[in-house]
A protein has these predicted regions:
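Active-site-adjacent beta-strand/loop module that shapes the phosphate/pyrophosphate-binding cleft
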Residues: 236-260
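The catalytic Nudix box helix
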Residues: 199-233, 248, 254-256
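Active-site lining segments that contact anionic ligands and/or coordinate catalytic metals
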Residues: 227, 233-235, 243-247, 266-267, ...
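N-terminal strand-loop-strand
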Residues: 157-199, 204, 226-227, 250-252
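Nudix hydrolase/Nudix homology domain
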Residues: 1-138, 149, 193-198, 263-313
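Cys/His-rich short segments
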Residues: 127-179
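Short beta-strand micro-motifs in enzyme catalytic cores
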Residues: 76, 88, 155-157, 172-174, ...
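Conserved hydrophobic/aromatic beta-strand scaffold that supports enzyme active sites
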Residues: 79, 140, 175-177, 187, ...
Length: 313
């Protein structure tokens, strides 16, 4: 079994947080949605191209949320849910972010501020970014080719011809920290990454494949390493554009640890001891995964302590 320890508490993953109830029962209730939109307590998140306005305060980085009467009158509305106080939240997607008089507000995306936001704000932005991207790429029916229109408060697209309903796409992907008999960790690097950047291996689940099978297949395809038993650790949405990262810990089979990279997805792969990783990071020769990614948390489980801070990439 993997030498990566099991955790008693869920991992604190930056993009796997939320502070609202998605309240799916209201998505097709047009009178309720209209009343919620016009309520003075309702807050609206303008979004464009995966970015929203944020402001840096003494309490931290926060989303700029507008009362609905101050929000732009054009754009696509997505109902995001309600909080414990009954406040409703909507996203408003447009071609560009609206102009603002507040000079402190700045546009930012999830990669930049996802880990800095509160649980509520992180959940709102992840939800909004995922929906915005899906709507932008699914304007036509995959059955008949006719245009589709938004329905279900932004959570459905319905064909204007054949009435087929299409739902937001989520692509399951496995990401894994693999160890060997010497308790070394397998990390890889892609050719397009910054020099010195290393991370855990990952890949999409294929049709007709279990997630455990996907872990073993991806590791063998990318690095030539054969994997035995694996254990689920945690998951995190990764809306770049539509992935759900399923985190695992696994152990390489004895005699199956020789590395042969595929040369396509990975340019290099390597087994690291804790001492090697620590020395490489201290020398600036190894850059660990960014704090927003589940990869960083998987490596930290094996490493036994937080990794040093790293720049966004």
């Amino acid at each position: 079994m993997s030498t990566v320890p099991e955790t008693e508490r869920p991992l604190a993953l930056a993009l796997a947080r939320s502070g609202v109830d998605r309240a799916a029962e209201h998505r097709f209730d047009e009178p309720w949605l209209a009343a919620a939109w016009s309520h003075p307590a309702t807050r609206v998140l303008p979004i464009a191209g995966g970015e929203a306005f944020v402001v840096d305060t003494a309490q931290g980085t926060e989303l700029v949320l507008l009362p609905s009467f101050e929000a732009p009158q054009t754009g696509d509305r997505y109902f995001l849910g309600t909080d414990e106080d009954g406040v409703s939240y909507f996203a408003l997607a447009g071609e560009s972010l609206p102009g603002r008089l507040d000079g402190d507000a700045r546009p930012a995306g999830l990669r930049e501020v996802g880990a800095l936001l509160s649980d509520r704000d992180a959940g709102l932005l992840v939800h909004a970014v995922a929906l915005e991207h899906w709507h932008r790429l699914h304007s036509f029916c995959s059955r008949c080719g006719h245009p589709t229109e938004k329905a279900g408060a932004g959570h459905v697209r319905r064909c204007t011809s054949c009435a087929a309903e299409h739902y937001p796409r989520t692509d399951p992907a496995v990401i894994m920290v693999i160890t060997d008999e010497q308790d070394r960790c397998l990390l890889g690097r892609q050719a397009l990454w910054p020099e010195g950047r290393w991370s855990t291996l990952a890949g999409f689940v294929e049709p007709g494949e279990s997630i455990e099978q996907a872990v073993a297949r991806e590791v063998q395809e990318e690095a030539g390493v054969r994997v035995g038993e694996v254990r689920y650790v945690a998951s995190q949405p990764w809306p770049f554009p539509s992935s759900l990262m399923l985190g695992f810990a696994g152990k390489a089979l004895p005699g199956g640890t020789e590395i042969t990279v595929d040369g396509e997805e990975l340019a290099e792969a390597r087994w690291f001891s804790r001492e090697e990783l620590r020395a490489g990071m201290a020398a600036g020769e190894i850059l660990p995964p960014s704090g927003i990614s589940i990869a960083r948390h998987l490596v930290e489980l094996w490493y036994g302590e937080p990794l040093p801070a790293t720049a966004r990439w």
